[in-house]
């Protein structure tokens, strides 16, 4: 994939490729330090140990270069379990309460929290949201930068870049919706193709 595009920004833009070559890669552990990182991970593990959910699966904390992805049910849940947790989360606000507890515990530590998808949320250093890539793109002086995302409301992991004045934000619901919106915007003569 990275060879097909001029730029690829992974993990909130903290891993950057240009013309298929790795340009920059940030590491959350280098930025936060091991002590804060372990305090954060330990707090999350303790919090999740006390959660009573209909189901729990594996991979509750996924360590990535630019963030931690926290999933109370576990990332290895089945698609059906994902939907079940999402419905429960809408009613009981499990992730919202978890994030509120983290915000209290780690106030002033330079951390941000954002909802990601149906079963998880992301934890990353302030300034490491999806706008991170825009500074690189500013240097290229593009006329327009379009962003497509599904978590575009406040608290969602797409909100900041969706709302940034340097982008034209598009809220989408699925990969198919994204393809359709791209056709409408960039290839209007093909907008009605399947």
Question: What annotation goes with each model-predicted range?
Answer:
Residues 54-146:
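Conserved acidic, metal-coordinating active-site core of Asp-based
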